[in-house]
């Protein structure tokens, strides 16, 4: 079946059925053994709010403008495309599972405050292609605009102060600002200034989320940008990328300062999710116990040529991608995004008490 020819109404109907499927499927919801009483955050969150890009997006980005709604995305879970840029789950799903809540509803479906039960679990505002500033993906809201949407819900009393006090926010702006800079032929000399500008905006954004009442904010550090399949050279990947190092260094220092300004700075309001060290550990693993091993960690399961994406087809319907036989043996799903098994490995490293 050529899914690109399906009508929007048919796809909408599929999504409604999918939402019911996810509600009853145990693999996306927490088990009693995985529920954390205190755990990573020091308290038991009951809600998760998510802001960011395609590493966290669970279906906000419109299916008319991105290939994440096309086969083979979603083949591992739940079996059909859900708008995730992966064969299955993404970072948001695994974080929600660790916390002990169901994956939060996307803003696209929950922005009207309904269904109430689903909205009460939190909400995902992340869009694929988003950045700290406007990126080359013109129709995608920046992180600041995503927070605007969150604030509008608060003004409508969709969430109470008590709701927010039992919540965690996940902020994942990884690299679209830098990708846009490269596409526009930005100079290497100007990259440092851009990095400082991006990090400054991220710090403003996460502080704003905290000021709106969210109890804690988890901020993703950037993984090694030059290790993406689309950028890896025959010599391998550059894990000592100075640009990524500067981004993470400035972000860490900025978050420390924000924590120091908190009234109760023993209860750290701003935390980091160290994707950089998790990725590097997995890339360099040669069989260390407890760390997943991938035969070729820099190779994409859904491989494409320059200018095409996983799920793309020609006008005649010919596939413009090559699909691997076993997605579980690949860390990367496509040239940029992580596979379900890849994300499982990352969170197993970062949250060692978890059972994914």
Curated annotation (Swiss-Prot):
Keyword vocabulary terms for this entry: Glycoprotein, Hydrolase, Lipid degradation, Lipid metabolism, Secreted, Signal
Annotated SUPFAM superfamilies: SGNH hydrolase
Active-site residues, Swiss-Prot/TrEMBL: 54, 334, 337
GO molecular function, one term: hydrolase activity, acting on ester bonds
Cysteine-cysteine disulfides: none
BP GO annotations: lipid catabolic process
Entry-linked InterPro entries: GDSL, SGNH_hydro_sf, SGNH_plant_lipase-like
Signal peptide positions (record): 1-26
Pfam family, one: Lipase_GDSL
Record EC number: 3.1.1.-
Glycosylation site positions: 25, 165, 185, 240
Compartments, record wording: Secreted
GO CC list: extracellular region; secretory vesicle
Entry's family note: Belongs to the 'GDSL' lipolytic enzyme family.
Stated name of the protein: GDSL esterase/lipase At2g36325
Organism ancestry: Eukaryota, Viridiplantae, Streptophyta, Embryophyta, Tracheophyta
């Amino acid at each position: 079946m050529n899914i690109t020819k399906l009508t929007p109404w048919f796809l909408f109907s599929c999504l409604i059925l999918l939402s019911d499927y996810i509600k009853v499927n145990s693999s996306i919801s927490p088990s009693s053994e995985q529920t954390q009483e205190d755990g990573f955050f020091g308290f038991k969150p009951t809600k998760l709010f998510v802001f960011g890009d395609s590493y966290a997006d669970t279906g906000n980005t419109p299916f008319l403008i991105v290939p994440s709604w096309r086969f083979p995305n979603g083949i591992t879970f739940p079996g059909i495309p859900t708008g995730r840029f992966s064969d299955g789950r993404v970072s948001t799903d695994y974080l929600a599972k660790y916390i002990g809540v169901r994956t939060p509803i996307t803003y696209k479906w929950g922005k009207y405050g309904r269904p109430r039960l689903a909205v009460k679990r939190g909400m995902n505002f992340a869009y694929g292609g988003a950045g700290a500033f406007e990126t080359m993906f013109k129709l995608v809201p920046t992180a600041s605009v995503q927070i605007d949407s969150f604030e509008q819900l608060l003004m409508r009393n969709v969430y109470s102060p008590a709701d927010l006090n039992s919540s965690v926010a996940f902020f994942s702006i990884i690299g679209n600002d830098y990708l846009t800079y490269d596409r526009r032929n930005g100079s290497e000399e100007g990259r440092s200034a851009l990095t400082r500008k991006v990090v400054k905006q991220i710090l403003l954004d996460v502080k704003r989320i905290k000021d709106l009442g969210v109890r804690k904010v988890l901020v993703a550090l950037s993984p090694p940008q030059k290790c993406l399949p689309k950028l890896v050279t025959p010599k391998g990947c550059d894990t000592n990328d100075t640009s990524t190092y500067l981004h993470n260094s400035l972000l860490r220092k900025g978050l420390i300062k924000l924590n120091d300004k908190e009234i109760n700075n023993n209860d750290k309001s701003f935390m980091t999710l160290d994707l950089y060290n998790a990725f590097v550990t997995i890339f360099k693993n040669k069989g260390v116990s407890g760390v997943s091993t991938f035969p070729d960690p820099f190779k994409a399961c859904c491989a494409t040529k320059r200018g095409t994406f996983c799920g793309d087809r020609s006008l005649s319907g010919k596939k413009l991608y090559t699909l691997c036989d076993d997605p579980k043996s690949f860390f990367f799903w496509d040239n940029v995004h992580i596979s379900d098994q890849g994300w499982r490995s990352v969170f197993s490293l970062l949250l060692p008490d978890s059972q994914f």
